[in-house]
Design a protein with these regions (language model features):
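Conserved helicase RecA-like core
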Residues: 1-345
Length: 345
């Protein structure tokens, strides 16, 4: 069981040993990585292929929902030794008889906490039970919870727990700010942050798919370079949005917590919580989108009076205290001392 902060190289930690143990002469699936989202599956696959570029003969397949299953069947016919997959799509292939897991000797659950929080407990259990009892099961996670420990207790044998604590060296460099606002002024205060021109790449989090679409359209109609991710999008459309975002074709990405899972962009400069997340862990996952690759990041939470009790619970969970900001009577964002915020940056 490996517990480590985001951005500490977990993929390399399991990817390098996996590649060392691949039997290139064996055409069966030997190693399996489960990830909670399509995006994370693709990212893991890309990293594994990069690590394997000097090992001729290694074949890696990526199985996820939203892509035509015929393409994935073609991958499986090439006899990959390593498979990276989301639980739902892997079960689909198993039920169709496209893949067998009885030769798997190494299985990794990446982002195990998120995967189990998303309701994949039964799917993950079925997949684990389709692998040999003597296989190695490795859990990688940023946090731990009861579901993770239940899987460990049931399916691991004398597990070793490796905890990499957040230190000054590996802790994301994120300055958190909380801004007092009112519901009717939240949109204009969002525009104030976007108009500052301090941040070139921003992620804005909202709580519902409908709000994501409406807020995105409102920003686009106002001339802002924005786009969004939501649960109803086809995988190809999601890929197009993320590719455009990474290439800088637009600067503002709006998303819900579910739609944003697995997104990995190193140079997001600011995260804005337009809505307060419903779960404490989501707050950490949100602000963790910035401050990656040892770069400094900032997060802003637009907080209304009715959300203060909920926010206090989040602060108790994260054991941190954001810097308070507010808007003056002149409509300028200021610190507690009354100093203009952006003039001091």
């Amino acid at each position: 069981i490996a517990i480590a902060p985001t951005g500490t190289g977990k993929t390399c930690a399991f990817g390098i040993p996996m590649l060392e143990y691949v039997n290139l002469k064996d055409k069966r699936v030997q190693e399996l990585v489960l990830a909670p989202t399509r995006e994370l599956s693709l990212q893991i696959t890309d990293e594994l292929k990069a690590l394997a570029r000097f090992i001729p003969g290694v074949r890696i397949a990526c199985l996820y929902g939203g892509q035509p299953i015929t393409k994935q069947i073609s991958q499986l016919k090439q006899c990959p030794q390593i498979v990276v997959a989301t639980p739902g799509r892997l079960l689909d292939h198993m039920n169709r008889g496209n893949i067998r897991l009885d030769s798997v000797h190494t299985m990794v659950l990446d982002e195990a906490d998120e995967m189990l929080n998303m309701g994949f407990v039964k799917d993950v259990t079925k997949i684990i039970e389709a692998t040999p009892m003597e296989r190695q099961l490795v859990l990688f996670s940023a946090t731990t919870n009861q579901d993770v420990m239940t899987i460990a207790w049931k399916y691991q044998q004398e597990p070793v727990e490796v905890v990499i604590p957040a230190t000054k060296e590996n802790r994301p460099q994120i300055t958190q700010y909380v801004i007092e606002t009112e519901r009717e002024h939240k949109y204009e205060h969002l525009l104030y942050l976007l108009d500052s021109d301090v941040y070139q790449r921003v992620m804005v989090f909202v709580n519902t798919k409908d709000m994501t679409q409406r807020l995105c359209k409102r920003l686009q109609d106002a001339g802002y370079p924005a786009d969004c991710l939501h649960g109803d999008m086809r995988q190809s459309a999601r890929n197009d949005v993320m590719q455009a975002y990474r290439k800088g074709k637009f600067q503002i990405l709006l998303a819900t917590d579910v739609a944003a899972r697995g997104i990995d962009v190193d140079d997001v400069e600011a995260v804005i919580n337009y809505d307060l997340p419903n779960e404490n862990e989501y707050y950490l996952h949100r602000i963790g989108r910035t401050g990656r690759a040892k770069k400094h990041g900032v997060s802003f939470t637009l907080l209304t009076y009715t959300e203060t009790v909920r926010f206090d619970a989040i602060l108790k969970y994260i054991m941190a205290k954001p810097v308070p900001l507010k808007f003056s009577e002149l409509g300028i964002l200021v610190t507690e001392d009354g100093e203009p915020f952006f003039e001091n940056m």
